[in-house]
């Protein structure tokens, strides 16, 4: 990945965080720049809705039927996105648990730490065809941090 691509991700992500009025618009802008600059076919941001359910608050690259299917799959506590909320550790380049789409998935927790306490606010989930290099992973982690701040800001 070029340093120009990295700069574009961080600049546009920071601008989306600072200037979007709604959380969905801010997050979709962040996802859009990821899809444009990295080899990401689709991306979603999922947050707990206050109960035991998860909701998709932003997506890019997914048709409505795929979004509906993912929303249904999130009811399964064994789904990788649901597992990332419980065990907030990034996973990269893992095969999908359900057929269809790109060959690999990556899941990054959206966390913030306040007063020494870390809170999981959601998950950045990506579908892609090729493994992610170390620099791409670092940029995705930075984007997940920006997304976490956006979610926290609008809670």
What kind of feature is each model-predicted range?
Residues 1-4, 75, 109-110, 141:
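Alpha-helix N-cap/helix-start motif at coil-to-helix transitions, marked by capping-box chemistry
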Residues 54, 64-90:
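Acidic/proline- and glycine-rich, intrinsically disordered low-complexity segments
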Residues 31-35, 44-68:
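GAF sensory/regulatory domain recognition
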Residues 1-25, 36, 56-58, 121, ...:
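Signal-transmission linkers at sensory-effector interfaces
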Residues 86-131, 137:
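Helix-to-coil/beta transition segments that act as allosteric "coupling" elements at the rims
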